[in-house]
UniProtKB/Swiss-Prot annotation:
SUPFAM superfamilies, sorted: Protein kinase-like (PK-like)
Gene it is expressed from: Sgk2
Protein localization: Cytoplasm; Nucleus
UniProt name for this protein: Serine/threonine-protein kinase Sgk2
Domain of life per record: Eukaryota
Record organism: Mus musculus (Mouse)
Motif (Nuclear localization signal): 68-78
Length: 367
């Protein structure tokens, strides 16, 4: 499994009293008791992801439950804001997970997300070791489409890895986890925060140089390499040596790859971000590469292409593609409990003003 993200920045409060306004409170009345929490399906630094069933209509969702105390202790309010803001923008893209609700109690934050149960790309790679080129091309194209969309919104993703790439029940990609995204980065602008996951860090990040959206194309190259060869391109169990490899070791591509695949990997994994594929025309550079010549991008976007792998899930309750380490864990009763008031206006809750959100009724009905 890839290492945990490193170098998460410590954001500054946006107001003198430390309160963060996370947007309009369109759904102030939602509460945990609206859902039956069935299984733990994932875990993170500040909480868990659970499979939940909405009592009113039986709809299934993935609910990310975060502990406010942990977030406040680590001064991560701004990251929660950034993740929520990015999630709101993702609703209309086919390969990005959508946010349906967000609400809070005095102790916890709740993200109610689209539920997909085809498993993490990481899960399937661990089981199969590597993919053939057509399958790797399909996943890479869908991920590139999602990354290109984020870039069009001036968002750098910064944490692309197999664990953050899910498959839906049909086998299409769903990109998730936007906690390290950087918003408001214009095409010619840079940022400099040291963050990401060690195996996938670009050289410019390791050198602590200003970097731009080309950092995401490096990560895409690293994920493609791993899909084709079973490990990230410069992997070493010694993290310091791995960093040295990323910075200085020439890219080594094992035999058996097509010329197009080798050329794409060399372009994406160019150590000079100014020469990297994607540094000039961003997603268009990727889209027009010969490796993707079999792809009709309009058909891809509209999910008219048949995925190369079908997860064969038997309905929402089928959890065979989730790690048993998670699914066998007991669901805490406190997650589904709620006080008489959904969230107080003082203490921890005041640091997350306006967190609550709900889609328009039309959006929910269309989904």
């Amino acid at each position: 499994m890839a290492s945990s993200p490193v170098g998460v920045p410590s954001p500054q409060p946006s107001r003198a009293n430390g309160n963060i306004n996370l947007g309009p409170s369109a759904n102030p009345n939602a509460r945990p008791t609206d859902f039956d929490f069935l299984k733990v399906i994932g875990k993170g630094n500040y909480g868990k992801v659970l499979l939940a069933k909405r009592k009113s209509d039986g709809a299934f969702y993935a609910v990310k439950v975060l502990q406010k105390k942990s977030i406040l202790k680590n001064k991560e309010q701004n990251h929660i804001m950034a993740e929520r803001n990015v999630l709101l923008k993702n609703v209309r893209h086919p390969f990005l997970v959508g946010l349906r609700y967000s609400f809070q109690t005095p102790e916890k934050l709740y993200f109610v997300l689209d539920y997909v149960n085809g498993g993490e790309l990481f899960f399937h790679l661990q089981r199969e070791r590597r993919f053939l080129e057509p399958r790797a091309r399909f996943y890479t194209a869908e991920v590139a489409s999602a990354i290109g969309y984020l870039h069009s919104l001036n968002i750098i993703y910064r944490d692309l890895k197999p664990e953050n790439i899910l498959l839906d029940c049909q086998g299409h990609v769903v990109l998730t986890d936007f906690g390290l995204c950087k918003e408001c980065v214009e095409p010619e602008e840079t940022t400099s925060t040291f963050c990401g996951t060690p195996e996938y860090l670009a050289p410019e990040v390791l050198r602590k140089e200003p970097y731009d959206r080309a950092v995401d194309w490096w990560c895409l190259g690293a994920v493609l390499y791993e899909m084709l060869h079973g490990l990230p391109p410069f992997f070493n169990t010694d993290v310091a040596q791995m960093y040295e490899n990323i910075l200085h070791q020439p890219l080594q591509i094992p035999g058996g790859r097509t010329v197009a695949a080798c050329d794409l990997l060399q372009g994406l994994l160019h150590k000079d971000q100014r020469q990297r594929l994607g540094s000039k025309e961003d997603f268009l550079d990727i889209k027009n590469h010969m490796f993707f010549s079999p792809i009709n991008w309009d058909d891809l976007y509209h999910k008219r292409l048949t995925p190369p792998f079908n997860p064969n899930v038997e309905g929402p309750a089928d959890l065979k593609h989730f790690d048993p380490e998670f699914t066998q864990e007991a669901v805490s009763k406190s997650i589904g409990c709620t006080p008489d008031t959904v969230a107080s206006s003082s203490g921890a809750s005041s640091a997350f003003l306006g967190f609550s959100y709900a889609q328009d009724d039309d959006d929910i009905l269309d989904s």
